[in-house]
A protein has these predicted regions:
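C-terminal catalytic lobe of FAD-dependent flavoproteins
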Residues: 133, 269, 276-387
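Active-site lid/adjacent beta-loop-alpha segment flanking the redox-cofactor pocket in flavoenzymes
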Residues: 215-320
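Central helical "cap/lid" subdomain
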Residues: 24, 176-224
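Dinucleotide-binding Rossmann-like beta1-alpha1 core, especially the glycine-rich loop
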Residues: 32-110, 232-235, 273
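Flavin (FAD/FMN) cofactor-binding and adjacent substrate-gating region
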Residues: 54-57, 77-147, 152-153, 159-166, ...
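Short Gly/Ser/Thr- and Asp/Glu-enriched loop/turn motifs at secondary-structure junctions
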Residues: 30, 68-72, 206-207, 296-297
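Glycine-rich FAD pyrophosphate-binding loop
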Residues: 7-29
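Gly/Ala-rich phosphate-binding loop of Rossmann-like dinucleotide-binding domains
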Residues: 3, 7-8, 143
Length: 387
């Protein structure tokens, strides 16, 4: 997404490095693929809206991201949550995003198999949707190559060379590359890449899981995505089955120092106690979920920051070293918007206050500790749907 945005802005002298044998085959392939735009602040909504615009654009290309603009329903089960929805609706209005309240009858028409009798409020966003994350990566890659961007897979970064406070070269397992800028969009390894440049940044991997059932009667691919904040659940239809995920109230998180640049985070084993709890909760609204045979389990370590904001932009401590990380589980769905913010941070003479607030320089080495960062980042995850 970053390379695509830069290339669209005319900066095509880019070399995209991926340690894996193919772009998007590791962490990206585990994503759930939902893209929601309703947020609590206009800046965040506009970021998500730009991502949707990019997915629409890519869907018209030869290699498609498998974008399905099916809309979404956000379901409140209490008056308190319904009040939050009213604030979200106002934020959407302020940002120019279409989002409307619908009654239970209309909600039932859009999602016939779901029971809306408990719903205190339902917020409908027609331009939300879902994509296939691996296809998104391949679509970006194809578009980038067409614009002249070079892509090198099976290429791992070993060293970032800095001279007089500025990035000059990157040493890889396949040779040395001279460069003026390094953009760090390395996900769970973003901490390690930053460390190579001499920066310590609090980028904390937190476990996340979802499951997909085998095909179920009545689930069609045009059904809307759904979010049920009080149950901390989200979902959609995938391959004729139910994709159901959630945000755990007691998260499992890692210290990125526990694995090296050439290593991998501890493999995530399916936690059936957690996954079954998702099923138990959702069965209150969708009884057919009870006992549905589970097939694929998606799992991984998306990275979170202590303040819940992305880390985007060039560091004043190491000129030419640019961050695009700590995406708080929105690296795929927000990729188009993140690319836009990155371009603004690098190419605009006066970036917006919002973009400036995402700077890596907000984390100085004396402003945080790892113990605090892990607790705070985990809290961001655990209160994702907090009121």
């Amino acid at each position: 997404g970053c390379a695509y945005a830069l290339a669209r802005a005319g900066k095509t002298d880019l070399l995209l490095l991926d340690r894996a044998d193919d772009v998007g085959e590791v962490t990206t392939s585990q994503g759930a693929g939902l893209c929601g735009q309703v947020r609590d602040a206009a800046e965040r909504i506009k970021l998500a809206m730009h991502s949707v615009a990019v997915f629409r654009e890519l869907q018209r290309s030869e290699v498609k991201p498998d974008w399905h603009e099916v809309g979404s329903v956000r379901i409140a089960l209490s008056d308190r949550r319904a009040e939050e929805f009213r604030k979200l609706k106002q934020a959407a209005d302020d940002a120019g995003l279409e989002a409307d309240f619908i009654d239970r009858t209309e909600a039932k028409r859009r999602w016939p198999l779901m029971d809306f009798t408990q719903a205190a409020s339902v917020l409908w966003c027609p331009s939300d949707g879902w994509m296939t994350p691996r296809h998104v990566a391949k679509s970006y890659e194809h578009a980038c190559r067409k614009m002249g961007v070079r892509v090198a897979t099976s290429t791992g970064v070993e060293e970032i060379r800095v001279k007089n406070g500025r990035v000059t070269e990157v040493k890889t397992n396949r040779g040395v590359v001279e460069c003026k800028y390094v953009i760090n969009a390395a996900g769970a390894h973003a901490y390690h890449i930053a460390k190579l440049a001499g920066l310590q940044l609090p980028i904390v991997p937190v476990r996340h899981e979802y499951y997909i059932t085998l095909p179920m009667t009545g689930l069609s691919p045009d059904l809307p995505c759904f979010r049920i904040p009080e149950m901390t659940l989200y979902g959609r239809v995938r391959d004729g089955g139910l994709l159901l995920g959630g945000w755990e109230p007691k998260s499992l998180h890692l210290d990125p120092r526990s694995y090296g640049l050439n290593g991998t985070p501890t493999p995530v084993e399916a936690d059936w106690q957690v996954l079954d709890s998702f099923e138990e909760s959702f069965s209150q609204l969708f009884p057919a979920a009870t006992g549905a045979e589970k097939g694929f389990v998606g799992k991984g370590w998306p990275t979170f920051t202590p303040d819940g904001r992305f880390i985007i932009g060039e560091s004043c401590r190491v000129k030419g070293f640019v961050m695009a990380g700590g995406c708080n589980a929105h690296g795929i769905s927000g990729s188009g918007g993140i690319g836009k913010l990155l371009v603004e941070s690098l190419l605009e003479r006066r970036p917006s206050a919002y973009v400036k607030s995402l700077s890596p320089d907000r984390f100085t080495e004396t402003s945080w500790t790892w113990d605090e960062a892990r607790v705070q980042a985990a809290r961001v995850y655990e209160t994702y749907y907090g009121v």
